[in-house]
Structure formats: C-alpha cells, structure tokens
Amino acid sequence: MKVTDVRLRKIQTDGRMKALVSITLDEAFVIHDLRVIEGNSGLFVAMPSKRTPDGEFRDIAHPINSDMRQEIQDAVMKVYDEIDEVVPDKNATSEDSEEA
C-alpha cells in the first residue's frame, strides 16, 4: 500500500498542532484528520483519534506495521517541508521583494 496523495493545511497558532492532513492510499482510500504535532523530540504525524468517556485518546485509524507508519510520516513531512519553503516570511515587506 502506498501513500498516493497528501493534502495539508498549516495551522497558524502558538499551540503544538502545526497542520491538519488528509492522505490517500493507493488512490482508493482517504484518511482525514491526521495532525502534524510539535513534540519534545521534533515534529511527528499523529493519527486521527477520538476521546473516550474516561478521557483517553484512541486512534480511529492507524498503520499496523512500522514500514507503513514510516511511509506516512515521510510523505506528510515532505509536503509539510515543501509548503514551509513556499510560504513567504511574515515579516517580509513588498519593498524586500522589489530589492531582490
């Protein structure tokens, strides 16, 4: 099974969640509500989950082997990094781009 599409929307907040993601597997199955989270050891992809009545979070969908988990992580982070490269600096002004 391969990740054939990644749709990512960055979140502009001060929180730990940095993006919401949908992935397509084999151009046939979509999983929504993955999240890019800033953890203590850097960014990682969290699977969609819901809160149980006792307050714990349980994954709704998740890979069952480490190879698939790594493929999802790599595909999502590649798109996340590409979007980071294209997003202009918030502090840049129109004069900065004219000088270049």
Swiss-Prot record:
Keywords: Cell cycle, Cell division, Septation
S-S bonds: none
Gene3D superfamilies hit by this protein: Stage V sporulation protein G (3.30.1120.40)
Domain of life per record: Bacteria
Biological processes annotated in GO: division septum assembly; sporulation resulting in formation of a cellular spore
InterPro entries recorded: SpoVG, SpoVG_sf
Keyword match Cell division: yes
Family: Belongs to the SpoVG family.
NCBIfam families, A to Z: PRK13259.1 (NF009749)
Role noted for this protein: Could be involved in septation.
Name the record gives this protein: Putative septation protein SpoVG
Organism: Staphylococcus aureus (strain MRSA252)
